Curated annotation (Swiss-Prot):
Description of how the protein assembles with itself and partners: Component of the septin complex composed of two copies of each spn1, spn2, spn3 and spn4.
Keywords: Cell cycle, Cell division, Coiled coil, Cytoplasm, GTP-binding, Mitosis, Nucleotide-binding, Phosphoprotein
Superkingdom of origin: Eukaryota
Residues bearing PTM Phosphoserine: 303
Molecular function, one GO term: molecular adaptor activity
Protein name: Septin homolog spn3
UniProt keyword annotation of Plastid present: no
UniProt gene name: spn3
One Pfam entry name: Septin
Location(s) in or outside the cell: Cytoplasm, Cell cortex
Species: Schizosaccharomyces pombe (strain 972 / ATCC 24843)
Amino acid sequence: MRTTKKSSKKGIPLNLMVVGDVGLGRTAFINTLCEKPLIRHNNNFDPAEASSVSPVEIVPYQTDIILEDGTKINLTVLDTPHFGEAIDNENNFDIILQYIESQYDNVLEEESRIKRNARFCDDRVHALIYFISPTGHGLRELDIELMRRLAPRVNIIPAIAKADSLTAQELQTTKEMINADIEYYKIPVYDFPYDIEEDEEAIINLSQQLRATIPFAIVSSDRLIEMNGQTVRGRAYPWGVVEVDNPRHSDFLALRSALFATHIEDLHNITSNQLYETYRTEKLSTSQLLLDSTVGLDGKNLSQHDQVLREDRLRAIELSVQKEIEEKRRQLLAREEALRALEEKLAASTAAMANASVSTLPSSVSSTNHSQS
């Protein structure tokens, strides 16, 4: 593992996806992570939408994070509203997986071009923070299925949401049970890998500490509280204050430091050199791009005729891959259009209900008020 960051005036890109059930504090976590109100809290409950279940959406938010040493992080946070609302989340799994793979497809398509696009934007997801409900137990079937399906494509970092709802003993027990489930179901979560022969002792110790912290106990809050003459981010309770940035209360600070500083390069390397390369190999294999060697045992080159045939075949397969990528992109655009249409329909329905409720007020209300005056 390497932690040396290349300085760049443009900044270091980091694409981070946050997944978790409604009510687990995704918005609060993202705002706390970015130290700014990047996303509005949705406190408006609409009864008209309570009975309807919307598919998960993937909503990007972009901001710059400036670290204490002046390093600039070009952060893209991908929020996932509506995840976990449905009883059957199979469709939601597919939407998230399809999004992650579509970013790999974009890179694969760019690599296949003879003339590269100098302004190509690499949107591959470097890490996925998965929020686990603080039930005091281990993983649910939903948690297991999602992490098992996505782990081969993205660095998954499990976290216990709203950890301040558990006592210290409950939290420790919950961590042990979750880790036991991760090991039992062989879920390859991101475990802060290190090379004991090449990495410095300080890096090895840090990685071991972070590995022992999994799953991260997260407390999020963008509220500032005065305590002992100091201003802290936290949550106030009758029995005291839980501080977001206090390592004794929350693992938030350790996670933020790992994402933005100590392990950002490692997340990049694993995404590019392992996860993407695995996907690329699978993609090219299914497209029959991994051709059998046509060089003879004596090591002689192909004949000119065979070379021409091989190049023609490669071009044909390349066109097939590009068409498949374009088709997947069209499907994503169609899904986004359907989601927008659904949102407009729900908004129109809500407005119609509001107008109907006003127009159906009893006439006796206004006449009574008139008589009293």
